[in-house]
Amino acid sequence: MAHKKGQGSTRNGRDSHSKRLGIKVGSGEVVRAGSILVRQRGTKWHPAKNVGRGTDDTLFALADGVVAFRKSNKTYISIETGA
């Protein structure tokens, strides 16, 4: 007879890598065109003036300027330019 029991197997032991979602710049920060503002799944934050939305719902700056957040029923992110 064996002196040790068999090890068996488990169905656990795997986990996905974190996706680093969330806000990347705060309100009042100066950004350049093309800068990523938010990484998200779905539209927790919505694009407003001078902000674009990627196919994965990422929000990015379309113009140089200052980031501004506005909340009504939804939270909107816009870029205020100097002009």
Curated annotation (Swiss-Prot):
BP GO annotations: translation
Pfam families xrefs: Ribosomal_L27 (PF01016)
UniProt entry keywords in alphabetical sequence: Ribonucleoprotein, Ribosomal protein
Keyword Ribosomal protein: yes
Gene Ontology molecular function, alphabetical: structural constituent of ribosome
Top-level taxon in the UniProt lineage: Bacteria
Cellular component terms (Gene Ontology): cytosolic large ribosomal subunit
InterPro entries tied to this protein: Ribosomal_bL27
Record region (Disordered): 1-22
HAMAP family for this protein: Ribosomal_bL27
Family: Belongs to the bacterial ribosomal protein bL27 family.
Record-linked NCBIfam families: L27
Protein name: Large ribosomal subunit protein bL27
Native source organism of the sequence: Protochlamydia amoebophila (strain UWE25)
Taxonomic lineage: Bacteria, Pseudomonadati, Chlamydiota, Chlamydiia, Parachlamydiales
The gene coding this protein: rpmA
